């Protein structure tokens, strides 16, 4: 399986502050050396990742109208607590997940980047809505054309605005990614600077492409609920 290796770049003075490269499974080489110890490490990674993915604490942060849909997921109708993400934190130092919901203006970009840097590892980012993904309909000087220009993004949620169910699906996709990640199990001091291995996830558009092409008879508007 292919992974994306992310390492901090101490020489970078502007974003991106990390270096990325596509590598093979980091445990495969160790399996050939010592099956027992590598298997034990694999079990520890799975247990730790299970705890991480089921206790993702979002940072209470919104920049535009998509935040209304984000707040709707916290109601009893959608019950975000099913995924362990109902603990909304007011401080980035206590949060694991930043959901950028809405337009990222140029004046807001330094604030978003500073808040992201204040979050402790491990941390993840969900870009919610067309404006956060690519600037949306605001192709103007005052809007950043995608929040991934200033911080790394793990999951993109399309829509203007996306429905709460779309954000819940994004959270489920993020949980799948977290389960397959490979991070240091403790603090790492040295040249590696805590490398992070993230799996290369297939976009939902590509995953469902064959299924959608196979559809010949579309449902009428009366049948869609």
UniProtKB/Swiss-Prot annotation:
Cofactor: [4Fe-4S] cluster
Pfam family, one: Oxidored_q6
An example Gene Ontology CC term for this record: plasma membrane
Transmembrane helix listed as a keyword: no
Catalytic activity: a quinone + NADH + 5 H(+)(in) = a quinol + NAD(+) + 4 H(+)(out)
Residues given in the record as [4Fe-4S] cluster binding sites: 65-66, 131, 160
Domain of life: Bacteria
Note accompanying the cofactor annotation: Binds 1 [4Fe-4S] cluster.
A GO biological-process term: aerobic respiration
InterPro entries to which the protein is assigned, alphabetical: NADH_UbQ_OxRdtase-like_20kDa, NADH_UQ_OxRdtase_20Kd_su
Function statement: NDH-1 shuttles electrons from NADH, via FMN and iron-sulfur (Fe-S) centers, to quinones in the respiratory chain. The immediate electron acceptor for the enzyme in this species is believed to be ubiquinone. Couples the redox reaction to proton translocation (for every two electrons transferred, four hydrogen ions are translocated across the cytoplasmic membrane), and thus conserves the redox energy in a proton gradient.
Name the record gives this protein: NADH-quinone oxidoreductase subunit B
Protein species of origin: Acinetobacter baylyi (strain ATCC 33305 / BD413 / ADP1)
Lineage, opening ranks: Bacteria, Pseudomonadati, Pseudomonadota, Gammaproteobacteria, Moraxellales
């Amino acid at each position: 399986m292919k992974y994306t290796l992310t390492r901090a770049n101490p020489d970078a003075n502007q974003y991106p502050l990390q270096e990325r490269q596509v590598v093979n499974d980091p445990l495969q080489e160790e399996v050939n050396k010592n099956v027992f110890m590598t298997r034990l490490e694999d079990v520890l990674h799975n247990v730790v990742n299970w705890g991480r993915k089921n206790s993702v604490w979002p940072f209470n942060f919104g920049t535009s109208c998509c935040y209304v849909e984000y707040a709707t997921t916290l109601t009893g109708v959608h019950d975000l607590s099913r995924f362990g993400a109902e603990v909304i934190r007011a401080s980035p130092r206590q949060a694991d997940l930043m959901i950028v919901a809405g337009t990222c203006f140029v004046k807001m970009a330094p604030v978003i980047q500073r808040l992201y840097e204040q979050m402790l590892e491990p941390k993840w980012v969900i870009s919610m809505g067309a404006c956060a993904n690519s600037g949306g309909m605001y192709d103007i000087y005052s809007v950043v054309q995608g929040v991934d220009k200033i911080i790394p993004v793990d999951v993109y949620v399309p829509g203007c605005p996306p429905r709460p169910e779309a954000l819940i699906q994004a959270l489920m996709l993020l949980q799948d990614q977290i389960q397959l990640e490979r991070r240091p199990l403790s603090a790492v001091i040295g040249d590696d600077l805590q490398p992070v291995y993230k799996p290369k996830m297939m976009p939902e558009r590509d995953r469902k492409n064959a299924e959608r092409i196979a559809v010949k008879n579309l449902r009428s508007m009366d049948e869609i609920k």
